[in-house]
């Protein structure tokens, strides 16, 4: 008979063998489970990847179909550009033209390609300009019809919202605005717009729905209208495919121009890449008929001059605490005896050789830095127009009657 010690030793050996077998089984099971998990995960990843690819493909098909539909329906005059945020932007194609071909001889605009179609002297075949004012969208802005324009943004925010869209995007320039305005004048299709609280002050039956649902012409409330909701006569070519709402509704920030202590500063052609510090300083100023710096009312009409001899506020003061200059028509202001006419400023509708041009009032402060808005807003009546130019405000100003419009280089 075996001793108790031998039996205990045998049990220990058997237990160790069982433990080893159990561990081996556990490892085998764990390995098989890991393999199953890997196969499951691989299958899930494959399914998700296939889904994402198909979803992306459907998105591409949908967006491409939308673009083709817009282009087809407009005969190629409109297109859709999706920005890096994925937001749609319906754009008007503006083809290059020669200034002399406009036939606007009395405006003394010179010859050659309009500067809107040149960048650092190199001509462009066409430019794309937002058909509508910019509106709020995911992570940025969009250019679509039938919505409220994005307002209450200052100059720098408007500019950044445009460049945020990606390469070749920019805030509409003073060059692009003027080119469209001059083409409209030559074509006999100068637009009207929302200039009287939801209606045109000229043809009051031309209306669009207001943001406050108010009646057309009711001066209470906010008379701002949805983008592109007016008749085709509110578009620059009087068709449904033209740039909308340039006149009235809301003022529009423009790039590549400013007024510095009364001096007019612009880029020489349509080049948003030029740093603001390198913009060209023209020998052109908005002088004042008086050096009054009391109050905040009008000091009279600006005088186009080769120097600012009288200012209505302290130099480099960007506030609106002092008098301003205003005239009912930008083209009718007096030119000082020593002023040398400037062809580029005529091409930009800042100076004019005749009053027989587009309408619109001019306002300015000849002290501090002032940035341009054009077109007028819903309550400006006869003061609104393609020529309307306000240089009242600093870059930091933001108002519910000021919006912006993106443009794109192809």
Can you annotate each of these PLM segments?
Residues 185-190, 258, 267-270:
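Short secondary-structure boundary/capping segments
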Residues 206-207, 211-224, 229-230, 237-240, ...:
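C-terminal, surface-exposed recognition/capping segments
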Residues 112-245, 318, 326:
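Short aromatic-cysteine micro-motif
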Residues 55-81:
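Charged, compositionally biased non-catalytic regions
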Residues 1-54:
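Short, low-complexity N-terminal tether/leader segments at secretion or assembly junctions of large
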Residues 73-168, 261-317, 370, 403:
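Extracellular adhesion/carbohydrate-recognition regions
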Residues 99, 134-135, 176-179, 257-258, ...:
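Short, solvent-exposed loop/turn segments at secondary-structure junctions
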Residues 36, 41, 47, 51, ...:
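A general structural signal for short secondary-structure junctions and capping/turn motifs
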